[in-house]
């Protein structure tokens, strides 16, 4: 996958999110800072500031497979930017499995993945990241890995950025062991239980309904959220297409 100009700035973005001065104008960044305030110094903490009467966030579930170029594009170029802009009204769930198949062989699950054994391995790696890391840090680490061409090789540098206390060896041990097998089996069950069944990947379910090819994720999230909209949603609502009549 071609390198994005956005990803190298991820560490800087996080620093900005965590270090915006208290006197800065209200914005999604300021909201994130307020949510991070109770965290210990030096530890990333991206927690949604929740009011007593706040409506629930919009749920976005992504069913995908790690080596699918379309999945990688959606994750890095659409889901991640949307998360950056409206993280406070968004609840993202990643389910790495996709179009894989499983079978029970003598009490152990074996998997066949659309893009070969390496995809099965990386599906397990990402499932283990989701299992072992705080949710937001797992999401950011997976975005980092999916952006880069050699995902397995870049597990270590991505962890160093977003979860420096977690060793790559512990993630690989999880992925190659019984826990990785169990996690991928759970993802298989979640994927197989989809109603309607998924037709392709990436398969995106927003508040329980499949997203159509015509939908734009950020606009859809803004439309579905029932509370006070973030500033970016207000901008979207006031925008319109310009046309030139003949």
From Swiss-Prot:
PTM text: N-glycosylated. Sugar chains contain mannose-6-phosphate.
Additional remark text: Both precursor form and mature form have thiol reductase activity.
GO molecular function annotation: oxidoreductase activity, acting on a sulfur group of donors; oxidoreductase activity, acting on a sulfur group of donors, disulfide as acceptor
Entry protein name: Gamma-interferon-inducible-lysosomal thiol reductase
Main location as per UniProt: secreted
Phylogenetic classification of the source organism: Eukaryota, Metazoa, Chordata, Craniata, Vertebrata
Induction of expression: By LPS in spleen and blood.
Tissue occurrence: Expressed in many tissues, including spleen, liver, lung, heart, intestine, blood and kidney.
Disulfide feature: 68-71
Keyword set includes Disulfide bond: yes
Species assigned in the record: Sus scrofa (Pig)
Stored InterPro entries: Interferon-induced_GILT
């Amino acid at each position: 996958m071609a390198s994005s100009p956005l990803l190298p700035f991820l560490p800087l973005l996080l620093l900005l999110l965590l270090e915006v001065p208290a006197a800065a104008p209200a914005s999604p960044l300021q909201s994130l800072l307020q949510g991070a305030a109770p965290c210990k110094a030096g530890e990333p903490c991206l927690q949604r500031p929740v009011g007593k009467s706040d409506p629930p966030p919009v749920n976005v579930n992504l069913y995908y497979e790690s080596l699918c170029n379309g999945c990688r594009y959606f994750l890095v170029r659409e889901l991640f930017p949307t998360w950056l802009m409206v993280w406070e009204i968004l609840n993202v769930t990643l389910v790495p499995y996709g179009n894989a198949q499983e079978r029970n062989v003598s009490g152990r699950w074996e998997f066949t993945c659309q893009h070969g054994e390496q995809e099965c391995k990386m599906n397990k790696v990402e499932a283990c990241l989701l299992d072992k890391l705080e949710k937001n840090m797992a999401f950011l680490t997976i975005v980092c890995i999916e952006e880069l061409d050699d995902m397995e090789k870049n597990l270590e540098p991505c962890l160093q950025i977003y979860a420096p206390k977690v060793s790559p060896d512990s993630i690989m041990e999880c992925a190659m062991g019984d826990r990785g097998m169990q996690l991928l089996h759970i993802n298989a069950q979640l994927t197989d239980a989809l109603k309607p069944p998924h037709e392709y990947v990436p398969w995106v379910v927003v508040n329980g309904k499949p997203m159509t090819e015509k939908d734009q994720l950020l606009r859809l999230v803004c439309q579905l959220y029932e509370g006070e909209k973030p500033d970016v949603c207000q901008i979207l609502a006031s925008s319109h297409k310009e046309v030139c009549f003949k």
